[in-house]
UniProtKB/Swiss-Prot annotation:
PTM field: Methylated by PrmC. Methylation increases the termination efficiency of RF1.
Subcellular location(s) of the protein: Cytoplasm
Family to which this protein belongs: Belongs to the prokaryotic/mitochondrial release factor family.
Keywords carried by this UniProt record: Cytoplasm, Methylation, Protein biosynthesis
Annotated signal peptide: none
Protein name in UniProt: Peptide chain release factor 1
Organism: Pseudomonas entomophila (strain L48)
Pfam entry (one): RF-1
Length: 360
């Protein structure tokens, strides 16, 4: 194992011993805030230290077996050869596990998200494809037991959406969807195409982590223009009777968010403010993330909204993710919610990039 990793593990072990002592301290126990914080840190560190202790034991076993290779007894030497082989195999597995455990964790991975899908080039066909993408993510959310609620929608003239915004709530939503941001391209023959020519259209997807109250950006009310209007939608006794829909404009940046799905103006405003906070937070963090990704050439993690990340080719039944040169001939399954077929290889590639950087 590299000396840099050993140093990190030794430092972590010192911290683990310190945490063990702190959690037994009466003063800490009486302070629930500190006790909870130390308990969370202990729970994160303990599995790493357990693995490290196991690695050191196997390392000691290896050194003992290697010493027996010089023994005069041929039976002992033969036994030692097998023990050396087994110990080396175990060390490879334990080192790999420790490296993964030491990877920096994205603090946003456990968060809910705002999912934004917008039609780009391609007119009506792009709007229809936006609808296809939204159904794909909706089915994926359903498979994972997530809750999806539409915040705002602007339907296309011939189906689909010019724009649709949804909030997705559940376990590790951002951790799964964070690499879906970018330009998604579709190649297919539109229903209105009489000569069977393949058209190319595109949509952009943005996945924004929903900030919690502790990290939400403080927004000056003087920087906001708030407009109310009547929500549109299917008929019913509540439609068009109150100005429940909310449009908020952040004047310094020009960002506009709308929410019209709730019947309560108060709920729509709360959702819109949370979404605005997510967009402002994304503006602050994306530039830094892009700089890091460029420096380390982590194409998977750049999150550039203009970057073409994936092509859906209907005639060939093909989905290609251009960031990792992944091609799958399972278009129907993926559009039916089987997005893990693309997401899991992306996450694996990102982890491999992180491991490579860890060893630098």
């Amino acid at each position: 194992m590299k000396a840099s990793l050993l140093n990190k593990l030794d430092t972590l072990q010192d911290r683990f011993e310190e945490l063990t002592a702190l959690l037994g301290d009466a003063e800490v126990i009486s302070d629930q805030t500190r006790f909870r914080a130390y308990s969370r840190e202990y729970a994160e560190v303990e599995p790493v230290i357990a693995c490290y202790v196991g690695w050191r034991k196997v390392q000691d076993d290896l050194e003992g077996a290697q010493a027996l290779l010089k023994d005069a007894d041929p039976d002992l030497r033969e036994m030692a050869v097998e023990e050396v082989r087994e110990a080396k195999e175990q060390l490879v597995g334990l080192e790999s596990q420790l490296q993964r455990m030491l990877l920096p964790k994205d603090p946003n991975d456990g968060r809910n998200v705002f999912l934004e899908i917008r039609a780009g080039t391609g007119g009506d066909e792009a709007a229809i494809f936006s609808g296809d993408l939204f159904r794909m993510y909706s089915r994926y959310a359903e498979k994972r037991g997530w809750r999806l609620e539409i915040l705002s929608e602007n339907e296309g003239e011939h189906g689909g959406y010019k724009e649709i915004i949804a909030r997705v709530e559940g376990d590790s939503v951002y951790g799964k969807l964070k690499f879906e941001s970018g330009a998604h391209r579709v190649q297919r023959v539109p229903e209105t195409e009489s000569q069977g020519r393949i058209h190319t259209s595109a949509c952009t997807v943005a996945v924004l982590p929903e900030p919690d109250e502790q990290v939400a950006i403080e927004i000056n009310p003087a920087d906001l223009r708030v407009d109310t209007y009547r929500a549109s939608g299917a008929g019913g006794q509540h439609v068009n009777k109150t100005d429940s829909a909310i449009r908020i404009t952040h004047l310094p940046t020009g960002i506009v968010v709308e929410c019209q799905e709730e019947r309560s103006q108060h709920k729509n405003r709360a959702r819109a403010m949370s979404w605005l906070s997510a967009k402002l937070n994304d503006m602050q963090t994306s530039a830094a993330q892009n700089a890091i990704a460029s420096e380390r050439k982590l194409l998977v993690g750049s999150g550039d909204r203009s970057e073409r990340i994936r092509t859906y080719n209907y005639p060939q039944g093909r989905v290609t993710d251009h960031r990792i040169n992944l091609t799958l001939y399972s278009l129907d399954d993926i559009l039916a919610g089987g997005v893990d077929a693309v997401i899991e290889p992306l996450l694996a590639e990102y982890q491999a990039d992180q491991l490579a950087a860890l060893g630098d």
